Amino acid sequence: MHTKMLKGASMGAKRKIEIRKVSRLGIWITLFLALAFVFLIIQGENEFFAMNESTEQYIQGEKAAQQLEKGADYLTEQVRMYVMTGDTSYMDAYFVEANQVKSRENALDTFKIYFDRTASFSALKAALDTSLELMTTEYCAMRLVCEANDVLPSSWPDEIKAAELSKEDEELSDDEKIKKAQHLVTEESYQEMKDIIAEEVTNCEAKLIRQTRHYQEKAMTIFSSMYSKLQIGIVLMV
């Protein structure tokens, strides 16, 4: 009987040891899963914030693209008003925008912060380059009107002073110079370049949408994957 009691005590001790081992293993598994949960939650928050950031960047990029186009349109409006009316306040407003406000250049700089070396940036830069190229025609148009209206050369902006007219244009009468100036900023070739600016801005916006959507879809895929892992972990703990 004494031997049976010893065997029973021995078996009870072994069971306690096994229970302790199982308990310790359970604790380690629980700790591991808890750490995994924390990691996944942090990573999930990072992806969520990254997705929000990409949305904010898209908004800023969209605003910049629109600002550039509005800046180019404003210059066109001012030069057209000047050659139509001869009111130098429009020419002054043109050069305040071009040399001081610089809406177009600032817009591209803002866009570059978020989207440098991307297809959307290249498209927006092409729009600015076309707008800058168009200014050569606008300078000539304003020079013609300045000469026709006997505006004092000393008051001309440097860009107008530097604008070169052809010999034929120099020999035009005052009325002919005004008509030529009006033609320069309304003719088909001028409008075609304006259309190119609009097309490049639209192209930029389309690429921006695709780029942002791709990034958001990628973030959502990662986020969904982590959510699934969390669900599996919860099931394992239960």
Q: Can you name each region flagged by the protein language model?
A:
Residues 1-31, 224-227:
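Positive-inside N-terminal membrane-insertion signal
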Residues 6-15, 81, 140-144, 238:
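Juxtamembrane segments at transmembrane-helix boundaries
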Residues 12-16, 42-55, 145-148, 156, ...:
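Juxtamembrane amphipathic/coiled-coil helical coupling segments that flank
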Residues 20-26, 39, 81, 196, ...:
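Seven-transmembrane-like multi-pass membrane architecture, highlighting hydrophobic TM helices
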Residues 23-74, 114-130, 222, 226:
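Amphipathic alpha-helical segments and their boundaries
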Residues 57-83, 101-105, 124-127, 131-134, ...:
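N-terminal alpha-helical signal peptides/signal-anchor transmembrane segments
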Residues 88-184, 188:
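Heptad-repeat alpha-helical coiled-coil/4-helix-bundle sensor or tether segments in soluble regions
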Residues 228-238:
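Selective detector of the "anchor" transmembrane alpha-helix that sits immediately C-terminal
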